[in-house]
């Protein structure tokens, strides 16, 4: 690494300073330091991936592993979000995500990693957070553990390893897709309360599903019966109420149309898939994509703008929002092609993952229906 930790720390402060937007020299110097700092993690990340592949094989030979260097946009957001955060101490510049079949395999891998020196401090302690045992307020579930791996010049670099199940991963993928199109920042505890409640309740139901025998043994028919029986049981009225709230939220029609939240989300996922293909084919440069989705016909119109054309894209977006405000048949969104690439990088199988997410939402809807009417019948009988 060409720069000292003091210079890296200063670059972190400068990244979120007011002066950086008006001082070209400061911007250039800061971005140069940031790029070098990020790049110094690349070979350490490769070493971490090699190390993990051997361990993962012992826990789940069908596990999915993805690595990434934290994007500049995400680094800036994190620095702004946490007052005491510094660039030099940010522990997830390099990150690896391991997606395993179920919680049993997640715990098996976690226990294996806990014994490895690369995850232990000099005094033998672990630096980790278990959001599966204690989920975040929004319902996020995963295990984060910090390891130290050497880069190509022998420097130790922090690498964050995230362990989660496929269902936990599908939940996170779907939240990212909603954030991308609605600009709510649910991930940062911002946005509409009804969406926060939806994802929190879904996380609760997913936790129940993951602990059922049918899920652990991948027996779909057994799982469906087990889950419906669980939800409709007389002692689980609160669980049934949560399932009903999820059912009502995703099936309610959007104002002025017969189009549901579920259908809108699926169109978002399909739109993202279409945009991503255009970007990957090199037909769209870095910049912005303006979408107009007709919720009655399912037709999607897209316009691509280069990065320098943001003002034009923003003005058109505002115009469409204003002119279509009274017409509930249209949904308008302005998304960054860079953000689309970010989802692909963090969630390479996002399209398939979103389908898995909604397949389990369908199960929750089915259980809500059966549970509600079973409960009604019980109340009448008593």
Which stretches of residues belong to each language-model region?
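Surface-exposed, low-hydrophobicity interaction/linker segments
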Residues: 29-81, 299-303
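A short, charged, amphipathic alpha-helix used as a generic interaction element across diverse proteins
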Residues: 309-325
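Short, mixed-charge low-complexity intrinsically disordered segments
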Residues: 326-373
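A short, exposed loop/beta-hairpin motif centered on an aromatic-Gly-Thr core
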Residues: 300-308, 332-335
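Helix N-cap motif at beta-to-alpha junctions
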Residues: 101-105
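Short Gly/Thr-rich strand-loop-strand
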Residues: 113, 119-151
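Short, flexible, solvent-exposed loop/turn segments with mixed acidic/basic and small polar residues
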Residues: 80-90, 321-324
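An acidic, glycine-/histidine-flanked metal-binding catalytic module
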Residues: 1-34, 38-41, 155-288
